Curated annotation (Swiss-Prot):
This is Putative outer membrane protein BBA52. Residues 162-281 are annotated as: Disordered. It comes from Borreliella burgdorferi (strain ATCC 35210 / DSM 4680 / CIP 102532 / B31). Keywords: Cell outer membrane, Membrane, Plasmid. Its main location: membrane.
Amino acid sequence: MIKFKLILIFFLFIVSTTYASVARPFDFRKWNFKKDIDLAYVLMHDLDNGILIKSQDKAGSIKSQEVLTKLNALNAYCNNLQRIIKAKLVRGRFQKEVELPLLKIIRKYKYLTRNYKNKSLIENPEYTKLIAERIIKKALFLENYFQSNRLKNVKSGENIKKRISDNQSKLKSLRSKPNKSVGSKFSKNSRPSKSPQGVKKCNKRRILDKYDLNGAESEFLDDPSQESDELEREYQDDELESEDPDDGEREYQDDRESRDDTFNEDQSEDEFFDSLEDQFI
């Protein structure tokens, strides 16, 4: 019983630490960070004969530590979300859907803060506001992506490779099967059609009697079905020769090549984002 309790406590501890790593540190959507930064700056300084000096009051340092603690917690929250999303996505998709939008946010605020000479937090309130705004936008983007359906429908790289190999094996099995449908199709439908009803049949016996050709009848009509059977066989052979049995094979080969091309396009896209990552890092 004691062992069971220890195992249960250990399991709950692991679950709590796992979910705590992605839990919101505070409601940053409603945080009026500009007001807190201005208040911390005012409390940290006093006016002495028109000169701004640092205050000896501890209220300013307490307020500034509160602002810095929130910024650090929010930054850690962003890093945890980014790590979890990266573990669930393949490399190319993570770079395309997550890293590049984050790089745009970082570049924007890097451009806005480029002219500030004093880059000390709280000491320069305007610079601190831009840094806080950048971290909040980054957290909002990662949080929205983490909660979106795009992350729920992600397939791992192993499943993708397995699906590709299954499709290739199916194509190979289809190519190896003989095309039996061609022979069966023409064996059923290759018989000569019946004569139309509007045409009168020729009375061959009367014509032979008229021209005294009864003796030659046996010569021409020994096997009346032999010539028709030979013609039917020749017709079937001609039709089978005209039908290309490799059409199905070419169709499956074209389909396979198109899938390979798609797959090659995805690989080149990964190489493109790899080069972008090398430029930005």
